[in-house]
Swiss-Prot record:
PROSITE patterns the UniProt entry points to: CRM
Gene3D superfamilies the record matches: YhbY-like
Leader sequence residues: none
Assembly: Interacts with RNA. Part of large ribonucleo-protein particles that contain CAF1 and/or CAF2, and RNC1.
Pfam families in alphabetical order: CRS1_YhbY (PF01985)
Gene coding for it: CFM3A
A single Gene Ontology CC term: ribonucleoprotein complex
Keywords: Chloroplast, Coiled coil, Mitochondrion, mRNA processing, mRNA splicing, Plastid, Repeat, Ribonucleoprotein, RNA-binding, Transit peptide
Deletion phenotype: Albino seeds that fail to germinate or yield very slow-growing seedlings and stunted plants. The seeds of the double mutant plants cfm3a-4 and cfm3b-2 fail to germinate.
UniProt name for this protein: CRM-domain containing factor CFM3A, chloroplastic/mitochondrial
């Protein structure tokens, strides 16, 4: 449809700004997918304005006369906006005339630059008629690519592509996505529907959605029959419960008994078996021979099968398992009418290995051979555990093996030269990973008499380096630990892992097979026999009486022979058969032991003395910080009736003060005065161990606060102290008294008190040790001439080593820390440094009051004198000998 040239359009101010903004930056183009409109030629309507400058810039629209061209070009494949490499030279020139070049129709022959030049048109025409090669075209196209990120690239519009939210044009944002553009590149209308073929192609592509799994019942039974059986399942109300023991032989017999009257059995799985329903699915199909037609949560519907009543049920089951999946699918297509006959192939998702037993036939041959060989080996080891809830092969029932074997001995082991006996971390990890995948070899329930199991494990280790033992239900963890220790002693293996379900043992690097072990034992027995014979010959030779001759020997004796040994013994050797000589040696040993014990006791006593002195110093440092207030001379008194009422009211009070480890400090007294502002009583809860300590705290509170102590009662939270403020109570100007410690210093004082309590306990311990040392010294004096073996052994056990002494000496330096003033501006300091000379004098004067100083000094002097007498006794004994 042609437009009349006499029609004019005068843009408004907004239109002017819009045109000016696009005029200097890029070439504006109106595109409709594959059709284009150039803004260069003046064929149709001319736009003009009143302004002379704008009148010179005319926009002319050219439209093809054929109205069906745009509809024919709708499905034409458009060129996608591929990533553009940077352009070598970019034309950013600004022209006064805003025109666009015409786009030549074709697949790849399009002009991308808004400024159409004559040379470019000539090149495009030459390429169209075949006068130019493809290489030249690629070189020109490479030169004319727009730089990525430039102004032209941002506002560049290509046919068939829509901008994304960020202003760019990507392959993913083509006309709203792949629902408009097909896989072959055709552009479709939004209202058009996809064909069935396109849907299948899209479904065949990979998606993140989990694929459906087909069970054995879905592949073997027709859909109508499967629907009927499921409806029958929903109408069946009774359920059979499978407990934590799993699918035992009793459960299998019960299921088969129910199949005689009904073709469907509903099961409810309980206990640990319900944690893995997929595995329970496989176990039920394998042990019963049925088919699981429905499963939801822990509920399973088990179908007995089409050929259940036939006598050759096992053969049919085996035949069904050996049927390949392709044949099953073909039979299913023939029986069902819902499948389209035109489709030759049915695309099913890939069946996983753990869904059906059909996949087990596709496993590699080495795994099957291992299972068969293991099954034969387990048959030789003992009877099977028929109630095993897991897969085949069934483990050996270790409870049926003999408990005690007469003359049982652990297997003989020899570690090869240069091999480390223990396992490295990587080796142990690899063996544990291997043990996870193998089935258990034994099932054990008892905890004693495991010699039969140990023998079977040794036989198993000849073929396999691991022995995996499953623990039956009901065995406690402590019992399994005892089982593991007993088996480790009986077999000599290495325990890799132990949990509530399995025990895994490694045979060890020093394990030997039965034949090799027997040969080595025989060889060792032969060597021992030869050694015994040689030793007997030496004893016979040494028992002969040899009299040393004074005449020089003319014969030379060869070195290293028995004759040389006898010669040397006769000349310089000591005869141990002499009783006097043995008594002398024993007496010397006793004297040395006596010296060592006295020296050890002396060190102990000296250390105890130092400990007592340091304990007294610590007590003195703590007492320096204590400056309690004195009791009032004329305290205000209350009557018994008032005391009874105040006690009753105070115990009913909900508000209370909690006195912690800091004890009585300025903050405690301040809180008491704050309580007395609104009430006459204050209740203080103290968590103390003894009543005497609570009484001291109560008296201190009464003295510091100026109140009247009403009562001290035992409550559930500790002890309750109730203090009455008095009739003539006046609030003091300073709520925090200056004579008490601050919160920080009170904490330091509590630490010192705790240390003092420990030191007092240590003092009492040292006092008891001192008494014990005195008694031991007195007893040692009685046995000086003749040693008492029982006494020496007792003292050696009491003072075995000097490690304890070194540890205690290291603890001597643990003095109270220094508590200095912080940044809160508190006054005073608590320092734990050295005592002054006056304090040392006070301690020396107070030493007699403690009752330890004089006794310890006298005791040390006695020990010193006794230790000096020991060398003299030793000399006398040597002269006597």
């Amino acid at each position: 449809m042609a437009m009349k040239p006499s029609l004019h359009f005068c843009p408004t101010t907004v239109t002017k700004k819009f045109v000016y903004s696009f005029q200097s930056s890029f070439c504006f183009r109106f595109l409709r997918y594959s059709s284009s409109i150039s803004l260069g030629s003046c064929k149709g309507v001319t736009f003009s304005s009143r302004n002379d400058q704008i009148a010179s810039r005319r926009f002319s629209f050219s439209r093809d006369c054929n109205n069906g061209v745009w509809l024919e070009n709708w499905n034409r494949i458009q060129k996608r906006n591929q990533p553009k490499p940077p352009k070598v030279v970019v034309n950013y020139r600004k022209e006064g005339r805003f025109s666009g070049s015409e786009i030549v129709s074709g697949d790849d022959n399009r002009s991308r630059d808004g400024d159409g030049s004559t040379m470019e048109k000539i090149v495009e025409k030459l390429k169209k008629y075949g006068y130019m090669e493809e290489v030249q075209n690629k070189e020109i196209e490479q030169e004319r690519r727009i730089e990525k990120g430039s102004v032209e690239d941002i506002f560049y519009v290509e046919e068939g592509k829509l901008p994304n939210t960020r202003g760019g044009f990507t392959e993913e944002s083509l006309l709203g996505g792949e629902n408009v553009i097909g896989s072959n590149g055709d552009v479709g209308f939004p209202w058009e529907k996809m064909s069935a073929k396109e849907k299948k192609e899209l479904e065949a592509e990979w998606t993140a959605k989990k694929e459906n799994r087909y069970s054995l019942a879905e592949m073997t039974l027709p859909e109508s029959e499967l629907r009927r059986l499921r409806n029958l399942t929903f109408r069946t109300a009774s359920k059979m419960r499978i407990r934590g023991g799993g699918v035992t032989q009793v459960a299998v017999d019960a299921i088969k008994e129910k199949w005689k009257s009904a073709e469907i059995v509903r099961l409810k799985i309980e206990g640990a078996s319900a944690l893995n329903m997929r595995k329970m699915h496989e176990i039920l199909e394998k042990k019963t021979g049925g088919l699981v037609i429905w499963r939801s949560g822990t509920s399973i519907s088990l179908y007995r099968g089409v050929s259940y009543e036939l006598p050759s049920g096992k053969w049919n089951k085996q035949r069904r398992e050996e049927t390949p999946p392709e044949a099953v699918i073909e039979n299913h297509d023939e029986t069902t009418t819902m499948v389209d006959k035109s489709d030759e192939k049915v695309h099913l998702p890939q069946l996983e290995q753990e869904t059906t037993s059909v996949e087990k036939k596709d496993q590699t041959s080495p795994v099957v051979e291992y299972e068969d060989e293991l099954d034969e080996l387990l048959d030789d080891l003992g009877p099977r555990f028929m109630d095993w809830p897991g897969d085949n092969p069934l483990p050996v029932d270790a409870d049926l093996l003999p408990g005690a074997i007469p003359d049982y001995e652990p297997p003989f082991r020899v570690l090869p030269y240069g091999v480390r006996s223990s396992l490295g971390p990587k080796e142990a990890t690899a063996l544990r990973r291997l043990a996870r995948s193998i089935p258990p070899h034994f099932a054990l329930g008892r905890s004693r008499q495991l010699q039969g199991l140990a023998t079977a494990m040794v036989r198993l280790w000849e073929k396999s380096m691991l022995a995996k033992i499953a623990i039956k239900r009901g065995v406690q963890s402590t019992t399994s630990e005892r089982m593991a220790e007993d088996l480790k002693k009986l077999t000599g293996g290495i325990m890799l892992s132990r949990n509530k379900d399995f025990l895994v043992f490694y045979r060890g690097k020093n394990f030997l097979s039965r034949e090799v072990a027997d040969a080595l034992v025989e060889q060792e027995r032969f060597v021992r026999t030869l050694q015994d014979e040689e030793e007997q010959a030496r004893l016979r030779g040494s028992s002969a009486l040899i009299v040393p001759s004074t005449e020089p020997a003319n014969k030379l004796v060869s070195a290293g022979t028995l004759g040389e040994t006898l010669d040397a013994t006769g000349k310089w050797g000591k005869n141990l058969d002499d009783d006097d000589h043995s008594d002398e040696v024993k007496q010397e040993v006793e004297i040395l032991r006596h010296e060592n014990l006295v020296r050890k006791l002396e060190r102990k006593l000296a250390f105890a003395e130092r400990k007592l002195l340091k304990a007294e110093r610590g007590l003195a440092k703590v007492e320096v910080c204590l400056k309690p207030a004195e009791q009032r001379e004329d305290p205000e008194s209350i009557t018994d009736e008032e005391r009874f009422m105040f006690r009753k009211l105070g115990l009913k009070m909900k508000a209370f003060l909690l006195l912690g480890r800091r004890g009585v400090f300025d903050g405690t007294v301040e809180n008491m005065h704050l309580h007395w502002k609104y009430r006459e009583l204050v209740k203080i809860i103290v968590k103390a161990k003894t009543f005497d300590g609570v009484k001291k705290v109560a008296l201190a509170l009464e003295a510091e606060s100026g109140g009247i102590l009403v009562s001290i009662d035992k409550v559930t939270k500790g002890y309750a102290i109730i203090v009455y403020r008095g009739q003539d109570y006046k609030r003091p100007t300073m709520l925090r008294p200056k004579n008490l410690l601050t919160k920080r210093k009170a904490l330091a004082r509590s630490i010192e008190l705790q240390r003092r309590e420990g030191l007092l306990k240590h003092i009492s311990t040292m006092q008891a040790k001192a008494k014990q040392l005195r008694a031991e010294i007195e007893q040692m004096e009685k046995v000086t001439d003749k040693g008492d073996e029982e006494l020496y052994n007792k003292l050696d056990m009491a003072y075995a080593s000097s490690d304890e002494e070194t540890d205690e000496e290291d603890d001597d330096d643990a003095f109270p820390e220094t508590y200095a003033e912080g940044e809160d501006g508190e006054e005073g300091e608590i320092l734990a440094g050295e005592l002054s000379e006056t304090e040392d004098k006070d301690l020396d004067s107070n030493e007699s009051e403690t009752g330890f100083g004089d006794d310890s000094v006298l005791f040390a002097e006695d020990l010193h004198t006794k230790s000096e007498d020991l060398p003299n006794k030793k000399v006398r004994l040597q002269h006597q000998s």
